[in-house]
């Protein structure tokens, strides 16, 4: 665990807001490798692309990690027609969202099926130490929430397949067919409806969006720079999360006691 902003003693957190994909679950590991070729194909019209376009797409995907998928597809739809190489391409961002989801779910569905059939343990698709960490937080009376840019039914289904849905007071994914961000709504609920102060809330995620949101609310922030394939800290994610203002960087939840101490627990 890397502490970036050392703080004086704080009160124990009462609620933790988690991102899901890449923070708790690895069921969607490799989503970038699905989104990138889709974007390149659509922007170029299948005519090939240069290194500059590839770098642009990679940079956008990295910077947009954690936001609602439809907003990524709105960027794609605009970029397709801005480039002019694919004038016959659809203009509707929801078309791109549907095509991306179709491609992605080809691999995600197989992983979920292997879980539900008992062919692999849930640890095969959980970030290291995540379930133990969730259990410990619940055992200490902390309320846990999920807010994800992935479609709400899919987040709920995948959390259940992993057996971690029972730890969360609320799981909020993106409303199907709507452009509403669940992360801002859940944070507002914690601060307003639950009557919590920012320092009583922590935000844990691998995207800059949720870390920025946590910083704005005065919450404690743990940037999870997960290397989903190999374990440890992903250097690119680390830099992005540092720029977003994360208080702490970790590669997973294996340093449980240090993370709990940071949360005042």
Predicted segments — roles?
Residues 2, 78-132:
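Metal-dependent phosphoesterase signature
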Residues 203-248:
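Acidic, Mg2+-coordinating phosphoryl-transfer loop and its flanking beta/alpha structural elements
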């Amino acid at each position: 665990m890397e502490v970036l902003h050392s703080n004086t003693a704080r009160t124990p957190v009462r609620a933790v807001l988690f991102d899901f994909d890449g923070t708790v679950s690895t069921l969607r590991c490799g989503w970038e490798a699905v989104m990138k070729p889709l974007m390149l194909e659509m922007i170029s019209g299948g005519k090939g692309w240069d290194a500059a376009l590839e770098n642009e797409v990679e940079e956008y995907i990295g910077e947009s990690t954690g936001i609602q998928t439809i907003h990524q597809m709105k960027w794609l739809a605009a970029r397709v027609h801005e480039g002019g190489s694919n004038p016959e391409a659809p203009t509707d961002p929801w078309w791109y969202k549907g095509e991306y989801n179709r491609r992605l779910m080809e691999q995600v569905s197989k992983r979920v099926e292997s879980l539900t059939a008992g062919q692999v343990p849930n640890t095969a698709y959980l970030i290291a130490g995540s379930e133990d960490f969730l259990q410990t937080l619940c055992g200490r009376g902390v309320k846990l929430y999920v807010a994800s840019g992935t479609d709400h039914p899919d987040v709920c289904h995948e959390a259940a397949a992993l057996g971690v849905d029972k730890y969360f007071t609320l799981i909020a994914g993106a409303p199907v067919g709507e452009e509403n961000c669940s992360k801002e709504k859940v944070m507002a609920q914690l601060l307003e409806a639950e009557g919590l102060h920012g320092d009583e809330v922590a935000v844990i995620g691998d995207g800059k969006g949720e870390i920025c949101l946590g910083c704005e609310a005065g919450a404690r922030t743990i940037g999870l720079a997960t290397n989903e394939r190999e374990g440890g800290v992903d250097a690119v994610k680390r830099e992005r999360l540092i720029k977003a203002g994360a208080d702490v960087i970790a590669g997973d939840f294996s340093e449980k006691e240090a993370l709990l101490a940071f949360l005042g627990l």
